[in-house]
């Protein structure tokens, strides 16, 4: 029997999603006759010899976002999925756009990377300078996002300068600012890629919120990708060095897909529900 070890953080903010994902993985492992052992990040002592680590497998499905821990596991010779560099680039929305900017064929939402130390409310003149820069780059509405955040959290729609100033004044973490894509109309496409193959695509739409996240009340239905769209998703996953991921696209004015963001530790439960298949089966089968 093949073994895979999974590492997760029990203090994960969205407890329900974490538990559902765990059950999905357990069911997938059972159907594939794989021994999947779960460990919390607290089970790993980085101050001990690697021979004393609790894993029966050299392959770690890393469900945490602790980049330092992932890098340490790699340093002792373990295969970590996703890799520390891939998690870092995907988890940081500013880095994601910087990495993909090296690939001009990947169309992205117009994005402005904000200053790293974001306490502009303490410096009114600098805050006004940044607002003027945003106004030169974009037309209202604009989207303000913390560079870290999942499930649609820390994402703000600013319809005018007053709302933008209010939003920026209350933030202390680095952000990105993006043009609001009105043609997408609270809808998006989530593409799941595993080991350079698209294993599922979902069209999502939210009637009650500008965010199209399933965790924010959006509903989903299967989406048929064209060959060009499939190639685009795989190109993004390869550029980000991600073994598996969820890529979110919006629709531009021509109804072509435009990159929004990528998720390294993608939650598979709701996508599996709408696609009527356990996506974790493809994930574990590709890892084993």
Curated annotation (Swiss-Prot):
PROSITE patterns the record matches: ATP_GRASP (PS50975)
One cellular-component annotation, GO: cytoplasm
Record flagged with keyword Membrane: no
GO BP field: protein modification process; SOS response
Domain of life: Bacteria
InterPro entries in alphabetical order: ATP-grasp, ATP-grasp_RimK-type, ATP_grasp_subdomain_1, Rp_bS6_RimK/Lys_biosynth_LsyX
Domain called ATP-grasp: residue spans: 107-288
UniProt-annotated binding residues for Mg(2+) 2: 261, 263
Gene Ontology molecular function, alphabetical: ATP binding; metal ion binding; ribosomal S6-glutamic acid ligase activity
Alphabetical list of PANTHER family matching this protein: BETA-CITRYLGLUTAMATE SYNTHASE B-RELATED (PTHR21621:SF0), RIBOSOMAL PROTEIN S6 MODIFICATION PROTEIN (PTHR21621)
Family: Belongs to the RimK family.
Annotated protein name in UniProt: Uncharacterized protein MG012 homolog
